Amino acid sequence: MMPTLNEDQRKALFAEVPGWTLQSERDAIQKTFTFADFNAAFGFMTRVAIKAEQMNHHPEWFNVWNRVDITLSTHDANGLTHRDADLARFIEQAAKGTGAK
């Protein structure tokens, strides 16, 4: 089983990926991204989907028009792992590249 992030690793992650919040009901992080329109949101989701498939680590997400809600957690570890941290970093880059607000 993959180890979950320790407290220092979590602090470092939150410093790198602003706006993500720890969910109170489980060991997962969440963030909402807003884009100019549906095409921009879908383009962002496509970039994330390709990376997630390469990593074999998939987000939980929900999309309505220009908004994308993303939750990350490693189900096998029952919590946050380095895979969530790596994907969150990529998601931040992808969001900036597609004009997220």
UniProtKB/Swiss-Prot annotation:
Keywords: Lyase
Catalytic activity field: (4aS,6R)-4a-hydroxy-L-erythro-5,6,7,8-tetrahydrobiopterin = (6R)-L-erythro-6,7-dihydrobiopterin + H2O
E.C. number: 4.2.1.96
GO biological process, one term: tetrahydrobiopterin biosynthetic process
Keyword DNA-binding: no
Highest taxon in the source lineage: Bacteria
Coiled coil ranges: none
GO molecular function, one term: 4-alpha-hydroxytetrahydrobiopterin dehydratase activity
Alphabetical list of InterPro entries matching this protein: PCD_sf, Pterin_deHydtase
Family: Belongs to the pterin-4-alpha-carbinolamine dehydratase family.
NCBIfam families: PRK00823.1-3, PRK00823.1-5
Protein name as catalogued: Putative pterin-4-alpha-carbinolamine dehydratase
Species annotation: Ralstonia pickettii (strain 12J)
High-level lineage: Bacteria, Pseudomonadati, Pseudomonadota, Betaproteobacteria, Burkholderiales
